[in-house]
Amino acid sequence: MDDYTNNLLSKIYVACHTLAISTEARWTAFVLFHRCLNVHSKSSSNTSTCHSNPGDNRKQRLANLASASVFLACKLSNETRRIRDVINVHQMLSFDDTADTTVIHLQDQPPLLDETYWETKAHVVKHEQDLLRIIGFNVTIEFPHRIVVAIWEELVQGQFVQCSKETSYSIIQSCWKYLNDVMFSSICTTSLRASALGCALLSLALEEHGLNDTENLEGLNWYEWVDVTRHEFHHAVNVVSKTKT
């Protein structure tokens, strides 16, 4: 993945935070954009996908698709934001490409309601439609967050894991920390099942706290509760481990 695409992913993360949308809406935005990127990488010369207009600048097209991903994610999550709000955030956030790490600057004022704004609005509407076509109208999203919470509550309530409330809170926070990392990974967001990903997140968090024993009192591995196989579980753990910062 090139630096510009990584910057766009960072921009999506900050934009979602600025728009004050939920964790699940943010996850939806990332999954949608990663699905688009996957098709783009496989069909870079196919004008029926991301190259709906061959004369478009690639960077600008991807930037518009990133904005469209956020806009569509808000709709799908019933957290609708005005298209102007999405455009404002999109245009107000800029990158310092000369830095060793991604540096994001926030302009003091939103863009003016000039011709450029109306052109951008038309682009966002157009690219939302393009985005849907690119991903084959697949807007089904699974959330590893729910898997993490469901399994952890069962482990604690079933007394399979003994820990204090403070440790319990810390474990969940570790899961969310790892989840923030995997949002930047196309493999994690589009190739792993949400159930396997959620189990991997929880396993790594438990390991971090010295509590990683996947076998419960009934002789089963807790990841089997959500129909995750041993192979799938260990593959997911391996993939997620490589994304940890």
Question: For each predicted feature, which ranges?
Answer:
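Non-catalytic, interaction-prone regions of core transcription and DNA-replication machinery
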Residues: M1-T245
